[in-house]
Amino acid sequence: MYVRVMAAVIACILLSGEALSAFAITPATENLSWFKKKKKKPEEREEKSKSDYEKLVEGSKTTKGMFAVHQKKNDFYFEIPTALLGRDLLVVNKLQRVPAELNEAGVNRGVNYENQMVCMEWDKASGKLMFRQQRPLPLAPRTDAIFRSVQDNFISPLIAAFKIEAVNADSTALVIKVNDIYDGTETSINNVFTNINLGTSAIKNLSRILSIKSFSNNVVATSELTTRVTEGTTTVYVTVEVSSSILLLPETPMMGRFDNQKVGYFTNPLLNFSDAQQGTDKTQYITRWRMEPKPEDREAYLKGQIVEPAKPIVFYIDNSTPYQWRSYIKKGIEDWQVAFEKAGFKNAIIAKEITDSMHVDMDDVNYSVLTYAASEKKNAMGPSLLDPRSGEILEADIMWWHNVLSMVREWITVQTGTVCPEARKVQLPDDLMGDAIRFVACHEVGHSLGLRHNMMGSWAFPTDSLRSETFTSRMNSTASSIMDYARFNYIAQPGDGVKVLSPHIGPYDMFAIEYGYRWYGKNTPEEEKTLLFNFLSKHTDRLYKYSEAQDVRDAVDPRAQNEDLGDDPVRSSLLGIENLKRIVPQILQWTTTGEKGQTYEEASRLYYAVINQWNNYLYHVLANIGGIYIENTTVGDGIKTYTFVEKEKQQAALKFLLNEVLTYPKWLFDTEVGQYTYLLRNTPVGKQENAPTQILKNAQAYILWDLLGNNRLMRMIENESVNGKKAFTVVELMDGLHKNIFGVTERGGVPNVMERSLQKNFLDALLTAAAEPEAVKINKKIADEHFLLDHATPF
């Protein structure tokens, strides 16, 4: 028996594994393990082998958000959900810190230097994640046959490819290494040195990633990038700190709103196709924030009740802003609330000071910030971040360069010093400066809301009305729009009793915000067209006129100019000059502080500011000569689009120029202050002194060159051909100039040195004009296509 049992056991040991397993469950084999040779189990039987994903995330520092960000030592990885593949993303690149050389040029923290829309695609064949630059497709009705062509005809470029390092366990996320796009190696989504006009590349071993953060709908990388710039035999290293964000755009774009030439909004153009067309055209959507009532308030809103928006606009004031100015900036931002109430929304725009107790991360691109930059640049700027598909403003940054305060201070003194005793000091009181800071902030926020400059705002107020205490108090401004370059009331004379001297929100601003932000509850832009037309038809008064900015030296419409006030340029400028004549004898007194060792630098600064103001007045008047009134017309409104400036006004303009600049303005250039200081001017090589007579010669030369420019002369010739004797002609212009400039010589007299200088300027201008090409296209368009950022003039 024993032998048979042992034979059976040995036979079982020789069976296959499956047979052994079946046999092993019988009671007879429970204690036979001593027959087996003991082997150490392989490690993989104790623990499953780790996947590429598990190996990658093991030991990583991980941040959760739109993408999970994994950091292993100096390597950074994005874990990208496959649900986001194909979604539209916006890359937003900003400067965070810059060297002194760039800072002095106004390239500072917060400047947005490059944006582009992208999407991601998984190329499974190559094992790569592709970045494709997305360009909004042209518009076309889905029911039209041409819609298929729009979908099939256009392709956007691939700009970057990433090896897929790992896929998570359930294949819902891909992992890519992103060092190259943030350390300067790859420039497809961040090309800072090209965009700030250095045209160089980052040096890899001198560039690095500082951090990457992930938020709910965006991820931001902060990098320190270094380049080498060579000029001649000199090499300079330039390091900048930049942030590069990838922002998830709304899955459903905001409904666009059509632009109208009667209202000044920045626009987002999209090509438009349809079967009914016999050509192509562009649809222009205005740029604006998504401002909608809450779902539960929509019925009340449409009945005319004022409600709170579902999402208000919030601006954060940078904690580097000097304390004494913060309240004024806050007021300037929130001044727009009255305009939003006209559009049916209360508490629609809010300003908050950033404090240490706030849980606000300024690296999150969702936050709109007023950034205060320690810079010599004299300006402020209000750019916006747009969804290119719809024109929706997603975020806005107000750039505030510190030295704008010096320019504002000069305006206050030069434009209001004769009627405001507090303006006659080197160091102005905080409340006076604060009022000016408030209007600058308000103007810049207007840009951040989508509004363009409206240079017709100042013309809306009659010149003489700006001397009325009653009118100025009622209108509470110097113009109908804060978006004009209308500064302080230089027209008011001592004794007029005018108290309101600065610009504020006006009728045009409220009208423009209502056009852009009133919610109609419609589903398509086309459904709003009639409602918007009806709204515009109720606002035809001069208070609601709009006109773009023009070239200062060749303005076509004299009503729409920079730095002007009133509707009569000659009278406004004469009143302004009367005030300047009162200021010049007081320059030394107003700029003397009593400080031991004080120089005449402040006197020189104020003297130069007075001359600049005088020069502004000259060009306000010059625009009348050869000028054309240009209206934004529609068929059937009974208004002419183009009307030449009246002959009498052009004659008065020439008389003004002959009396005020094409002569020797002794009151301005033969002064006591000129005995103590020359005019100081900042140049790229430092401060430069200029003799007053040199400044006068330059002013006369520019006026004569611009009077005799071909564009102006061709407009005058056209006027004469259309209106005959009712026109102010080129012959009359030349005759007036010749008689005035050479009058002494023709009468047999001997011209003095200043008269000879003017005669030479006139001859130079004639030679310059004669050298211009004869064929000139008559320019009736006021301005070229707009730029979202203003560079040429302050604000």
Where are these regions (language model features)?
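Auxiliary tRNA-acceptor-end handling modules of aminoacyl-tRNA synthetases
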Residues: 27-77, 81-321, 339, 348, ...
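The catalytic-center signature of Zn2+-dependent metalloproteases
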Residues: 32-35, 48, 353-373, 435-492
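Sec-exported extracytoplasmic/periplasmic mature domains
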Residues: 334-345, 446-447, 451, 488, ...
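Extended catalytic-interface subdomain
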Residues: 381, 386, 392-397, 441-449, ...
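Soluble non-cytosolic domains of exported or imported proteins
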Residues: 79, 111, 280, 319, ...
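Bacterial N-terminal signal peptides that target proteins for export
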Residues: 1-6
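C-terminal segment of classical bacterial N-terminal signal peptides
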Residues: 15-22
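Conserved catalytic/binding loops enriched for acidic/polar residues
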Residues: 458-795
